[in-house]
A protein has these predicted regions:
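Conserved loop-to-helix junction within protein kinase catalytic domains, corresponding to the end
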Residues: 125-127
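Domain-scale signature associated with acetyltransferase and cell-envelope carbohydrate enzymes
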Residues: 1-123, 134, 143-155, 162, ...
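Conserved coupling/switch loop of ABC ATPases
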Residues: 166, 184
């Protein structure tokens, strides 16, 4: 297990390859977040990584019986990530929060999915001129970066390499096709796909029962 990497002046902690059960990452991750971390019973952290750029007010919670293989990044002060119970976050997935990302219960997220609640940089060049330098120091100014919470409802399923952008709410039971770019809200129990993602059709009653 590798403790704080200073290269990016953030705080990072890797879970060991092969996975670990409740308790193995919990103490270290809680220390990085100054106690604001909880991991539910039976949750498996499998080669996951937590990066905390600035720990002030940041928090992370993961429910019970989930499997986490993703990288989770808390970019700014007060950033929050909430992951429910019985969720799967696949390898190569990045959950990148500068505001708040909330993932409900029974959510399936395939590999290499990107979920972001921010634009990363300001559109105005003068306001992003020193972003890289300050980001490496953990002192990046997020004041002029657009941030809006992301919420993924219970029972949703996100296909491989989907991208979910800031301010999006994905409704309960919805299915996001592989490679889709989700830029606006998705109604509950809806199949969407494409770039940008568009409604393909509502899920049938039979499909809803299977979810």
């Amino acid at each position: 297990m590798q403790f704080i990497r200073s290269l990016l002046k953030g705080f990072q902690e890797d879970a060991p390859a092969g996975g670990c059960s409740l308790g193995d990452p919990a103490a270290t991750w809680s220390r990085l977040l100054q106690g604001r971390c909880s991991i539910g019973t039976g949750t498996r952290i499998d080669a996951a990584r937590l990066t905390v750029r600035n720990p002030h007010g940041c928090s992370l919670s993961i429910g019970a019986d989930s499997n986490i293989e993703a990288a989770i990044v808390l970019e700014a002060q007060q950033a929050e990530v909430r992951i429910g119970s019985r969720c799967h976050l696949g390898g190569g997935t990045l959950v990148d929060a500068a505001c708040k990302i909330e993932i409900g219960d029974d959510v399936l997220i395939a590999f290499e999915v990107l979920i972001m609640d921010h634009d990363s940089h300001a559109l105005c060049f003068d306001r992003r001129r020193f972003d890289v330098r300050d980001w490496m120091k953990g002192t990046k100014d997020w004041t002029h970066v657009t941030r809006r919470p992301v919420r993924i409802g219970n029972k949703a399923w996100l296909g491989a390499r989907a991208i979910v952008l800031k301010g999006v709410t994905i409704g309960e039971g919805s299915v996001i096709g592989a490679g889709s770019v989700v830029t606006c809200d998705v109604p509950a129990w809806t199949l969407v796909g494409g770039n940008p993602a568009k409604t393909i059709r509502p899920l049938t009653d039979e499909e809803r029962e299977s979810l």
